[in-house]
Amino acid sequence: MATKSNEENIAEFKGHNEIQIELMKEECIVVDNDDKPIRPGSKKETHLMVNINNGLLHRAFSIFLFNGEGKLLLQQRALEKITFPGYWTNTVCSHPLWIVGSELVEENAQGVKIAAKRKLNHELGVPLDQVNIDDFTFMTKIHYKSESKEDPQWGEHEIDHILIMQKDGITINAEPNEVMDYKYVSQEELDQLFKDEDEGKVKVTPWFRLIALNHLKPWWNNLNNLKPLVEPTNTIHRY
């Protein structure tokens, strides 16, 4: 017989993929409004709208990987994903974990960069030896909240650290439970993707759209000279 906690899990996860359910046990970093770590919180706890609507906030990161031609790598989230399944989004968007001395390290955004390398490998199969922590440039942070329309008991409420990397020779072997498709796009092709979304032809994650429409173009146009555009780590854009 299922315990009470198991019964609750069955109700919340009904119809969802077992691998994705298991990942909901990961310990994210619960933060305050200024992105200061408070405590660990499971991926499940931090993504339930009942908690989000009570103010629960966690740390995240978004990777924007460009190739040598200046094209941006996008992924389409697998249908197995619990939040925003089938949506197009930036290269990788995920969460650093509550790991002291590693993904919790604040200096130079070291912790989120360690997490970013881990998730490039997990989601897109990028070999660990093809990515160095120093390949990532931290740009800024955004604070946003969004409900997952497909299953509105789930959502996001994050302070999202934006990381940019430009590199050729990246091997991609996408994990099908995470990623159903991927492609490199030009600025014009990304503009078309948003037009297609407006016409109901595709779905795009809300955080990617926010970042792309409010911040991305100056970075994209200055990939060879990002340093002047890097913002202080205490800068948080609220949406």
Swiss-Prot record:
Coiled coil: none
KW Ribonucleoprotein (keyword) present: no
EC number(s) on file: 5.3.3.2
Signal sequence extent: none
PROSITE patterns xref list: NUDIX
Pfam families: NUDIX (PF00293)
Protein family according to the UniProt entry: Belongs to the IPP isomerase type 1 family.
Protein name: Isopentenyl-diphosphate Delta-isomerase
Species: Dictyostelium discoideum (Social amoeba)
Gene: ipi
